[in-house]
C-alpha cells in the first residue's frame, strides 16, 4: 500500500482512495486486479527491541553478551550463526575468518549497514570489533537464504503471485540503495534472506560501497560470480547500480525456477562469451511472458537502457493489475 502526496492511498496507479479504510473495504469486496480479495490482516511480526543493549556506543557491544548456537552457513569471508544476544534476543552473527579479509574492510561493512534502514534490507543491530573474531550482529530471518528456501524449504511450493511479490520486495530494497548511491555488486538469491510471511531482505553488503563517482572500479583480484554479473562489470570492472539491475534480472530467473543455477549447462567462460555476443537466457518454463520481458529489460547491453529499480518496483507491485488489464509495457529506459 502506497501513499499519495495529498494523503490518499493506493495499490495500483489507476485507482486511489481518500482513506486506508476505504482502500481495504474496496479490495475486501473486489480483488480488482489483485491475485485475490483481501481477507484478514497479516499477523504482526515480533521485532526485537535492541536499543539500550550496547555498552560503549550505539553499535559496539561486549562479545560476552553473544551466545552462538547454530551454524547457518559460510561465505567468502566468514561464517553465519544463529545466536542469542543478552540471553533474550534472537540474532544472526556473521564472523570474520582469520587472514581472509582486512579487519578494516569488515568494519567498513558495518559502517555501511548501520546507515541502512528499510523494511527490505537486513538490519544491523551491533558489532563486536574489540578482540577476535569480529562479529556483525543482525536480525535473524526465520527461513534463511532464499536459495535454500526455494530449493529445499517451504519455498518449493510458492505460487507465481508469491514469486512476483518477493521480487517486488527485493526491488523495493534496491530502490533504497539506488536512491542513496549504494551498489551491492553481488545481488543473487543466496544473498536474500526470507522471514515470516515470505518477507524478503537484501543481505551481505560486504561488497557494497557508497558511490561518490558514477562508476566504482573494484580492486584487482576480487572475484565476482560471472553468471550474475553484467558484462561491463565482468569484462571491464565497471560496477554501477545498473549492473545491479542486470543481476536482479538473473535473480528473478532463480526465483521462478526455484533456485536453478542460471545458464544451466554452461560454464562461466561460455556464459561470458555468449552474453557479450548478445545471448540471453531463454524464458524459463512456466514463466509468464510479461515477467520474462521484465527480465530481458534488465539485460539490455547498454547500462543506461536498463530500467531503474524504482520503475522495476512499480512494475512488479502493479504486475497483476497491469496483466489483468492487458496494459503491461516494457519499462522505458531512464
UniProtKB/Swiss-Prot annotation:
* UniProt xrefs under SMART domains: TyrKc
Family, similarity comment: Belongs to the protein kinase superfamily. Tyr protein kinase family.
Predominant location category: cytoplasm
> Which residues are ATP-binding?
72-80, 94
* Keyword Kinase (UniProt): yes
Which domain of life does the protein's organism represent?
A: Eukaryota
Q: Which UniProt keywords apply?
A: ATP-binding, Cytoplasm, Kinase, Nucleotide-binding, Phosphoprotein, SH2 domain, Transferase, Tyrosine-protein kinase
According to the entry, every stretch annotated as the Protein kinase domain falls at 66-321
Enzyme active site = 186
Give residue ranges for domain SH2: 1-42
The protein's location, in the record's own words, is: Cytoplasm
State a GO cellular component annotated for this protein.
cytoplasm
Q: What is the taxonomic lineage of the source species?
A: Eukaryota, Metazoa, Porifera, Demospongiae, Heteroscleromorpha
In its UniProt entry, what is this protein called? Tyrosine-protein kinase SRK3
Known PROSITE patterns for this protein?
PROTEIN_KINASE_ATP, PROTEIN_KINASE_DOM, PROTEIN_KINASE_TYR, SH2
* Gene name, Swiss-Prot/TrEMBL: SRK3
**What EC number(s) does the entry state?**
2.7.10.2
Stretches assigned to coiled coil: none
Q: Which GO terms describe its molecular function?
A: ATP binding; non-membrane spanning protein tyrosine kinase activity
Alphabetized CDD domains for the sequence: PTKc_Src_like
Amino acid at each position: 500500500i502506497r501513499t499519495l502526496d495529498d494523503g490518499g492511498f493506493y495499490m495500483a496507479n489507476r485507482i486511489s482512495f481518500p482513506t486506508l479504510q476505504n482502500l481495504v473495504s474496496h479490495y475486501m469486496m473486489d480483488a480488482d486486479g489483485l491475485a485475490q480479495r483481501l481477507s484478514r490482516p497479516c499477523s504482526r511480526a515480533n521485532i526485537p527491541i535492541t536499543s539500550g543493549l550496547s555498552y560503549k556506543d550505539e553499535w559496539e557491544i561486549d562479545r560476552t553478551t553473544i551466545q552462538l548456537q547454530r551454524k547457518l552457513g559460510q561465505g567468502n569471508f566468514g561464517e553465519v550463526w544463529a545466536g542469542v544476544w543478552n540471553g533474550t534476543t534472537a540474532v544472526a552473527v556473521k564472523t570474520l575468518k582469520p587472514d581472509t579479509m582486512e579487519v578494516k574492510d569488515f568494519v567498513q561493512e558495518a559502517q555501511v549497514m548501520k546507515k541502512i534502514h528499510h523494511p527490505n534490507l537486513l538490519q544491523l543491530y551491533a558489532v563486536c570489533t574489540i578482540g577476535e573474531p569480529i562479529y556483525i550482529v543482525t536480525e535473524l530471518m526465520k527461513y534463511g537464504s532464499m536459495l535454500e528456501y526455494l530449493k529445499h524449504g517451504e519455498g518449493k511450493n510458492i505460487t507465481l503471485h508469491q514469486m512476483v511479490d518477493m521480487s517486488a520486495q527485493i526491488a523495493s530494497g534496491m530502490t533504497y540503495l539506488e536512491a542513496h548511491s549504494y551498489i551491492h555488486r553481488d545481488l543473487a538469491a543466496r544473498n536474500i534472506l526470507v522471514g515470516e510471511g515470505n518477507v524478503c531482505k537484501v543481505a551481505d553488503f560486504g561488497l557494497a560501497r557508497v558511490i561518490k563517482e558514477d562508476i566504482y572500479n573494484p580492486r584487482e583480484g576480487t572475484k565476482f560470480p560471472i553468471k550474475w554479473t553484467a558484462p561491463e562489470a565482468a569484462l571491464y570492472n565497471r560496477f554501477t547500480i545498473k549492473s545491479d539491475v542486470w543481476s536482479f534480472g538473473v535473480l528473478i530467473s532463480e526465483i521462478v525456477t526455484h533456485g536453478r543455477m542460471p545458464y544451466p549447462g554452461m560454464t562461466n567462460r561460455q556464459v561470458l562469451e555468449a552474453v557479450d555476443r548478445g545471448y540471453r537466457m531463454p524464458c524459463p518454463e512456466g514463466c509468464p511472458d510479461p515477467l520474462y520481458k521484465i527480465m530481458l529489460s534488465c539485460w539490455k547491453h547498454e547500462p543506461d537502457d536498463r530500467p531503474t529499480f524504482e520503475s522495476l518496483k512499480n512494475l512488479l507491485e502493479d504486475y497483476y493489475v497491469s496483466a489483468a488489464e492487458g496494459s503491461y509495457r516494457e519499462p522505458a529506459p531512464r
